[in-house]
Amino acid sequence: MTVAVSTKDSTREFAFEKADFKNVQKMLFKKAGINLSDAKEAMVYSRLARRIRARNLRSFNEYLALVNKSESELEQFINALTTNLTSFFREPHHFTALADYLRQHNVTNIWCAASSTGEEPYSIAMVVAEAFGSFKTPVKIIASDIDSKVLAKARAGVYPLASIAKIPHHRQKQFFHKGKGTNEGKVKVVDELRNMVQFKKLNLTDAKWDVKGPLD
C-alpha cells in the first residue's frame, strides 16, 4: 500500500510549498526587478501570511492572483518583501569622492536610485551643502524607491538619535534638530536640507522613468 505524505507544515496557517515560494520569487522579479534569495523562504511566509489574512483569502495562489490584478495590493506585496538596510554615510569613502568631484566638476543633477528611508540622499545633500557653503545650490538631488512606506519615512526625515552617532558633531548641529519631550531620543533633518531632496516613487522595471536628465 502506498501512503501519500503531505509536505504542508502543520504549524502554518496557510499551505506554503516550494512552488508557492518560487511563484512569489517570479512575481517579485517580474513586477519589481528584485531577485529574492532562496534563504528568504521563512521571511516570505511570515510577511505574506499577514496579507493573506488581512484580505480574507485562503491560499498563496489566491493572494498572488490578487496581486496580479490589483495595483494597491501590488504595492503592499512589494512593501512587505523589500528589505531596507541603510545608514548615514554608510560608505564614507564614497562621500569623500563625491566632495572631491563636486569641487572639480559642474554638477547639476544627482540621482539616488534606491533611496530607502532617506539616509543616503540626505548624506549626499549634506556633502553638496558643504561644497557650496549653502543650502541653496544649483544641484538637484532626486531620490527614488519602489517602497511607498520607506519613502514616507524619508520625506518625514525623522530618525532615532542613535542613527547619527557616527556623524561628526558639527554636522549634527548644522543638519539635525534634536527632539524634546515626547520626541526625545529622535532627530529631524532640518527643513533646509529636506528641501534639497526630491523624493519619488519609481519602479526601475518601468519602461519610462519620471526622472529628467542629464544625470551626473
PLM feature spans:
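Short, well-ordered amphipathic alpha-helices
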Residues: 97, 121-131
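Active-site catalytic pocket residues across diverse enzymes, especially alpha/beta-hydrolases
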Residues: 102, 128-132, 158
